[in-house]
Amino acid sequence: AKQLAAVAGLFSDNKIKNGDKFLVTDAWNPSILSIKYMAELLNINVEIHAIWHAGSYDPTDILGLKMNKSWSYPTEVAIYNACDYNYFATEFHRDMFIENLSITNDSKAFISGQPYNYLITDLLSTPTNKSDIVVFTHRLNTDKQPDIFRHIASILEDEYNIHSVITQELNLTKEDYYATLRESKVSFSCSLHEYLGIGMLESLYCGAIPIVPNR
């Protein structure tokens, strides 16, 4: 809301000019429609670039599970059409978006991948010291199925004396988080939905063996 108010102030102060570009790093953002509204009302030609992470168009995402599609689908289509460039990490996610929302003009949908190079520099250069730990790096949402991991973790602890860590349940700094990954032997995922997969990639770079669903 504060960002939208700041952008509205820039329009009001005549600081937004023809050719200006907006990059919105999560497309599910009301600012996009507001930017489009203000720009067209004031006859200012701007470009809007947006990154789609997830939405109600994905039946396994939290929005897909909770949102009423009678309004969420038209809203996602409106956001897509308001943007000049819509970015998706993979062909799979772009195609899901286009198919489930019945997008007729796919010329605005681009596969961008994600910039992971910084992880290689930051993580691969640090030595690891492994312990018998299985780590769960994901959000505690239904699409990540944390209860499945908790069940497995209890068996590992009781029968094999293997410790498990759910990072989202701990108040870790980034440095502590990476230290946990470097100490863990295995990184576990049972996610129904994965977009960036950054937690598994971080785990891999920290030397943890990834275990993921066979989908």
Give, region by region, the residue ranges found by the protein language model.
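N-terminal pre-catalytic "stem/leader" segment of glycosyltransferase-like enzymes
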Residues: 1-39
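Active-site proximal beta-strand in glycosyltransferases
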Residues: 21-26, 40-62
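Membrane-proximal helix-turn-helix segments that form the acceptor-binding/catalytic region
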Residues: 65-86
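Donor nucleotide-sugar binding/catalytic pocket of nucleotide-sugar-dependent glycosyltransferases
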Residues: 81-124
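Conserved donor-binding/catalytic core segment of Leloir-type glycosyltransferases
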Residues: 116-157
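Short alpha-helical segment that forms part of, or immediately flanks, the ligand-binding pocket
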Residues: 178, 201-205
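Aromatic "clamp/platform" in nucleotide-sugar-dependent glycosyltransferases that forms part
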Residues: 192
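Short hydrophobic beta-strand element within catalytic cores of glycosyltransferases
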Residues: 209-213
